[in-house]
C-alpha cells in the first residue's frame, strides 16, 4: 500500500528541503508541483531529492497545483503537505499501515503546531469504528485543512472531486467536506501526522475588501461542491461566521459586510437535517445584524474572560 504525498510549492526553495526530509522515505510516492516559482524551487528539489517527482506549471494557485498532483499520482491514497510544513517521524508508516488494515475512503489523523492541536476530534469520534457523513453532520465537525488526512485515490476519482480553481480561500474546507458528502467510509486515528511550522509573520494578513470578496467566493461555490444540504449549510455558516469575525476585527459594520460579500444572495440557508447550529442559522436567516451583534458579544466576553 502506497501513499502519494502531494506538495504544492511556490517560491519555496528555503523551506522545501526540510519538508522533504520529513516526507521522503523510499516507500511512498512524493510529488512536488512547482506553481510558477521564480526562486529555483524545482531545481533545488531535483538536485537534493532525485527520487521525487517534480511537475512544473505556470502560476495558477494551490488548487490547480494539487489537482495536477492528483492527476499524476499513482498511490492508493493522497496526502497533502504544504511546502513549509513537515510530517512527524514515522507518520507515513503508521498511517499507511492503518489505512491498509481498515481501508477507509477518508482517514482523519492529527495535525499539530508547537502551540496547539488543529481541528481536534478526540472525545467526539472513536478510532475503532467507521463513520459517515451523517455522523459528521450530527457532531458538527468542521475542518479547514486537507492536511493531516488521507484520501483514497479510487474514491476521490470515483466522486470526480477536484480542488476549486479560481478561488484562493477556504478551498481546503470545500474539498474536505465534498469528500465527506459522498457515501464513503470515514475513520479517525490517533496518529501524530502533520506538523504545522509557525513562522514570524505567518499569521499576519491584510483584511481589505479583496480579502472579504475572496472569502465570500467560497460561500457561493459550496453548493456546487457539497451536495449534502445539511453539510453544505454547516460549511456556509462557518464561512459567514468567519466573515463576521474578521469584519468585527476591522471595525466594519454589518451593512458593510453584507454589501461587500453579497451575503444576502446566499440567504436563507436551509436548516433541514441540521443537528447542531440550527438556532444560529435561523437567527442568520431572520437578521444578519442580530447574528453580527451576537458574535460581537461573544468576542467581547471571551476577551474579558
Tell where the protein language model's regions lie, with residue ranges:
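Membrane-interface aromatic/basic loop that binds lipid-linked glycans or pyrophosphate carriers
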Residues: 25, 251-305
Amino acid at each position: 500500500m502506497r501513499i502519494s504525498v502531494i506538495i504544492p510549492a511556490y517560491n519555496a526553495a528555503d523551506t522545501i528541503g526540510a519538508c522533504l526530509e520529513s516526507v521522503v522515505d523510499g516507500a511512498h510516492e512524493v510529488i512536488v508541483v512547482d506553481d510558477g516559482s521564480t526562486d529555483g524551487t524545482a531545481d533545488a528539489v531535483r538536485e537534493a531529492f532525485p527520487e521525487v517527482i517534480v511537475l512544473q506549471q505556470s502560476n495558477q494557485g494551490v488548487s490547480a497545483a494539487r489537482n495536477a498532483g492528483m492527476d499524476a499520482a499513482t498511490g492508493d491514497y493522497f496526502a497533502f503537505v504544504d511546502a513549509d510544513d513537515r510530517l512527524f517521524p514515522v507518520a507515513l508508516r503508521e498511517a499507511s499501515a492503518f489505512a491498509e488494515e481498515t481501508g477507509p475512503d477518508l482517514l482523519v489523523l492529527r495535525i499539530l503546531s508547537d502551540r496547539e492541536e488543529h481541528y481536534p476530534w478526540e472525545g467526539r469520534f472513536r478510532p475503532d469504528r467507521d463513520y459517515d457523513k451523517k455522523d459528521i453532520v450530527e457532531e458538527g465537525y468542521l475542518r479547514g485543512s486537507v492536511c493531516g488526512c488521507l484520501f483514497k485515490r479510487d474514491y476521490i476519482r470515483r466522486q470526480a472531486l477536484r480542488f476549486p480553481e479560481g478561488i484562493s480561500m477556504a478551498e481546503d474546507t470545500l474539498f474536505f467536506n465534498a469528500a465527506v458528502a459522498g457515501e464513503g467510509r470515514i475513520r479517525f486515528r490517533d496518529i501524530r501526522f502533520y506538523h504545522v511550522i509557525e513562522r514570524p509573520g505567518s499569521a499576519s494578513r491584510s483584511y481589505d475588501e479583496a480579502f472579504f470578496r475572496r472569502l465570500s467566493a467560497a460561500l457561493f461555490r459550496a453548493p456546487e461542491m457539497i451536495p449534502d444540504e445539511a453539510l453544505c449549510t454547516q460549511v456556509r455558516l462557518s464561512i459567514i461566521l468567519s466573515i463576521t469575525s474578521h469584519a468585527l476585527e476591522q471595525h466594519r459594520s454589518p451593512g458593510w459586510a453584507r454589501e461587500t460579500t453579497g451575503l444576502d444572495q446566499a440567504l436563507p440557508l436551509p436548516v433541514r437535517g441540521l443537528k447542531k447550529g440550527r438556532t444560529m442559522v435561523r437567527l442568520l436567516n431572520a437578521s444578519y445584524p442580530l447574528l453580527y451583534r451576537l458574535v460581537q458579544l461573544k468576542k467581547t466576553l471571551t476577551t474579558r474572560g
